[in-house]
Structures are given as structure tokens and as C-alpha cells.
A protein has these predicted regions:
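Short acidic, glycine-rich surface-loop motifs adjacent to enzyme active sites
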Residues: 87-99, 245-258
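ATP/NTP phosphate-donor binding region
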Residues: 2-82
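Accessory alpha-helical/coil subdomains and C-terminal extensions
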Residues: 8-11, 15-21, 37-48, 168-257, ...
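Short glycine/serine/threonine-rich phosphate/pyrophosphate-binding segments
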Residues: 23-24, 98-103, 133-137, 259-262
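Internal gly/pro-rich beta-alpha loop/helix module
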Residues: 119-195
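Short Gly/Thr/Asp-enriched flexible loops that form oxyanion-binding sites at enzyme active sites
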Residues: 92-115, 262-269, 298
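Short beta-strand segments
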Residues: 15-17, 92-94, 118-121, 159-163, ...
Length: 349
């Protein structure tokens, strides 16, 4: 049975959204222009050596990842939902600038996921000589197709593949605008290391219950704002942000382990916002580590003001999760309760 299954090729669906990986270089003036799916794949003939059936769908038109918005996440999830029973895994080709946001969003949208959904892209276009696109895409497809001896997906979660590392999607952040090693997962270990061999860290990989069924959530509410605290921030600035019409939530980017100025005006503005039904989530500006409210005097006022701890969540995952929860729940209390606990392994508490 096992041998028979191994003889059958796995099948992977590529979902092209755009980004640098989908670009080619004009040989005459070296400008970059989008390539269609067939052209992109023609630059990587090695894909034929994989024991995998590959099919593809594409956004039309392809989009720069700086233009990504929640409706695009719904489109990606729609392709996965429609083709879920037809493929063993999915690879999303995406621009690097907002890839961590999209990977986080998809992790919350896809409840009961038992197949790999792997985001990847590149720092150099696929048509450029030293491009990292080839290695990233080949490895992403290989991992999306990989099964264990029971025929189950090796990595049945939303992940991000870049420069030899497969990371949990909602734990990643883009750490470098120029290096090939562009992404990091500072607060959660890798799922797979792709070196000479593929090394799976199984204890880091999440598995749903055997009877889990895919359910896709499509509602986001983007009435949120990210407010970064800085030395000298003025009361008028904070007041103006919290006074935005229709605002439902604020991601408050704080110092260190969740600290902010102890000035009473800040506590008063946030307390007033909390009383009016606006959710405030505390996320550290540090790339690694966790919010520990109450650890220092500088965060005690935030507790009094009703701020929710984001623990060690990334900014990207906090934004995506807030939009997701606001789309799911009308009640502020429901959003605050669920924001404080892990949904898809996006935080450690």
C-alpha cells in the first residue's frame, strides 16, 4: 500500500499572486516586467525532475504585494477552498514585502487545515542570473508535496519558505530588504531546515485532529490602526488616532516588554477608548521577546486602561488576527478574549 502510494505522484497547486518572483528582466534596458505563469516556470526546468504533478492558477492582473489587502486574502483562500480535495498541497507565490501579513491572515482563515499551504517568493526576479527564486520555489513545492508513511502531509499548516528555512507563517517577519535570508521567525523555531537533506522538526509542527474539516472564514474588518509609541509622542497625536471615525481596534507598538510613557494623559485616552468599545492590543517593537505587562511600572497603566497583551505575537500576525476577529465577532469582549489566546500557534502564553 505504502509503495503504491509512493508511486503515485503528489499534486501541488501553485497560486501566483505577483511579486518579484514573477518578474523578468528586459535584456535591452534591464527594466523589470511581469511574466505569465508559463514564462516563470520555463526559467525553472528542474521542476520536471520533481516527482510532483504541478498545476497553477494566477491572479489577473498580478499585483505588487504593497497593494495587498484583505480581499486578496479572500481570493487566495478561495482558490484553496475550491481545489482543496484535488491537491495534496498549495504553494502561494507572493511579493516579499507583505508576505508575512498574508501568511498570518491565511493561517486564521483556514480552520481545520490538514494540507500544506506554503508561501514563498524571492529577492531577485526569476529571470535574473543569481535569483533565489529557483531554490525557494523548488523547495516549497517539494515540502508541499511531502507525505509521511501514513500518507499524511508532513507539514499540514500555513508556512513560509525562504532561504532554506520553512517557518510557521504567522510567526514570520521580513527582517532584511536586501539579503536572500530575508525572513525570520524570532519567537518560534523552524519547522524544516532544507540543507543537503530536508530536516523536519516534527515537534514544532502543528497537526489538526484526524476528523478536522476545512472551514474557510472570509470576513475581515480593517477598521484598525497601528500606533507606534516613540519618545516625545504628543497627546494630540494619540487623541487624533483614537478619534478616527469607525475605529474598532489599535495595535499599540510599545517599548521593550510592553512599556509606554507613564504620563496620565496616555492612560486616560486609552481608558476612554476602551470604555467606548475600542480594543487596544500591546505588541512590542522588538523583533524578539514578549510583552509582559506589569513587569515594569511603565506598563501598569496600560493594564488599568484595559489594554490586551499580545504576548510574543508579531506585528504582522497581530494586524491580521485583529482584522479576522473583528470580522468574526461584533462584541468587543469576544475580540479581547480571543486576541489574548493562541488560535493557530501565533503566540506563546
Amino acid at each position: 500500500d505504502y509503495k503504491k502510494r509512493m508511486e503515485n505522484k503528489s499534486s501541488v497547486l501553485l497560486i501566483f499572486t505577483g511579486g518579484t518572483i514573477s518578474m523578468g528582466e528586459n535584456s535591452s534596458n534591464h527594466s523589470l516586467a511581469p511574466l505569465d505563469t508559463k514564462q516563470v516556470l520555463s526559467f525553472i526546468p528542474e521542476l520536471q525532475m520533481l516527482h510532483v504533478n504541478i498545476a497553477s492558477v494566477s491572479f489577473s492582473p498580478l499585483i505588487d504585494s504593497s497593494d495587498i489587502k484583505p480581499s486578496n486574502w479572500v481570493e487566495i483562500a478561495g482558490h484553496i477552498e475550491r481545489h482543496y480535495n484535488d491537491f495534496d498541497g498549495f504553494v502561494v507565490l507572493h511579493g516579499t514585502d507583505t508576505m508575512a501579513y498574508s501568511a498570518a491572515a491565511l493561517s486564521f482563515m483556514l480552520d481545520g487545515l490538514k494540507k500544506p499551504v506554503i508561501f514563498t517568493g524571492s529577492q531577485l526576479p526569476v529571470g535574473v542570473l543569481r535569483s533565489d527564486a529557483k531554490e525557494n520555489l523548488i523547495t516549497a513545492i517539494e515540502l508541499a508535496a511531502a507525505k509521511n508513511e501514513r500518507g499524511e502531509a508532513m507539514v499540514p499548516e500555513v508556512a513560509l519558505m525562504f532561504e532554506g528555512k520553512l517557518m510557521r507563517g504567522n510567526r514570520t517577519t521580513k527582517r532584511n530588504a536586501e539579503d536572500f535570508d530575508a525572513f525570520a521567525s524570532f519567537n518560534y523555531p523552524e519547522l524544516v531546515r532544507a540543507g543537503v537533506h530536508l530536516k523536519y522538526y516534527e515537534h514544532n509542527i502543528h497537526r489538526e485532529a484526524n476528523d478536522a474539516q476545512l472551514k474557510v472564514a472570509n470576513h475581515f474588518d480593517d477598521n484598525i490602526v497601528v500606533l507606534k509609541i516613540f519618545p516625545g509622542i504628543r497627546p494630540e497625536t494619540v487623541k487624533a488616532v483614537y478619534s478616527i471615525a469607525g475605529l474598532r481596534a489599535v495595535v499599540l507598538e510599545t517599548f521593550g516588554s510592553g512599556n509606554a510613557p507613564t504620563a496620565q494623559w496616555l492612560c486616560d485616552i486609552i481608558s476612554e477608548a476602551t470604555a467606548s468599545g475600542i480594543v487596544t492590543v500591546n505588541v512590542t517593537q522588538c523583533r524578539a521577546g514578549s510583552v509582559e505587562m506589569g513587569h515594569y511600572e511603565a506598563s501598569v497603566n496600560l493594564i488599568k486602561a484595559g489594554v490586551v497583551s499580545g504576548h510574543d505575537i508579531t506585528l504582522e500576525a497581530a494586524v491580521a488576527k485583529l482584522m479576522f476577529l473583528l470580522g468574526k465577532y461584533e462584541s468587543t469582549e469576544d475580540v479581547k478574549r480571543e486576541m489574548a489566546v493562541p488560535w493557530r500557534g501565533e503566540m506563546t502564553i
